[in-house]
Amino acid sequence: MEKRWKPGAYVHFTLSERGKTRAIDAPRIQDRQVHKTFTKKVLLPLYTPSMIYNNGASLQGKGFEFSKRELRNDLRWHFRRFGRGGSIILIDFKQFFPSVSHAELLNRHELLIMEPDIKQIADDVVATVPGGRGMPLGVEPSQAEMIAFPSALDNYIKCQLGIKCAGHYMDDYYIMVPPDRDPKEIMKLVVEKAGSLLLTVSLSKSKIVPLTKPFKYCKAKFFLTETGRVVMCGNRDGVKRARRKIKAFHGKIQNGEMTYEDLWTSVNGILAYFEGYNDHRRVLKLRRLFYAIFGFSPEKIENFRMRGAANEVYCAYTFQE
């Protein structure tokens, strides 16, 4: 409040995760202290009341799993009233963080933040990105700004359009349309409303899917059966990565780069991911692969500790190129 703080330069680096490269801007440690306090004490208390419950990103008690769980609940709610009639609209935005308008953010600060000095801090964080567009990934106030930015669109979908089952995780949206309404008209209205916020919908990634067919949301595949059961399967590419990792772990064990305790943690972390889905067959196949390579079951930690104490290395599996 003494007007001595000015945001410093970010540390820029790229992060490649699952084939997607992202540019990350990390703040200095002295700026992180201000960012964290400002986000928790100012931004979130101001923005949270206008957010819908199904906005599941980076909020306490919510997150990636929350968004998938809410979609499953909405599918069950829809089935009890309409069966498998109707459709689901899946929407994704182009360059969600890099393309957001600074003018829209500053207008929101003007509307909600009454104290001039506090508003100046919020404006200074936005101004760290030149060009009048974009917010940095990796900065906590930026994350809070972008979580709340589509709230006008969210409330338009829920209130003006009267859609009960709708939600999103950051820029990944789902909108469940009853059978008595036109999904193309709903999608057109949503795209127009997003355009008024200067958000661009990626038409190549957005689509309308009948609820009788499977669809993907948040890296998971969903299917509503004829009995109303919601089947959720994990990402198929994750199985390929898991198999490569398990094979690589054997080489690390042989070379002494990995302990059996670390092997227990890593393998069961992989299995736990698929156990959270309706993926029993995939879990079973991964356990069989582990047994073929290491010669013991991955379920019990005693198996790992016993071999770690004996410094044993075993392989009954023939790798194929």
Region spans (language model):
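Active-site-proximal segment of RNA-dependent polymerases
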Residues: 39-101
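Short Gly/Ser/Thr- and Asp/Glu-enriched loop/turn motifs at secondary-structure junctions
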Residues: 10, 167-171, 204
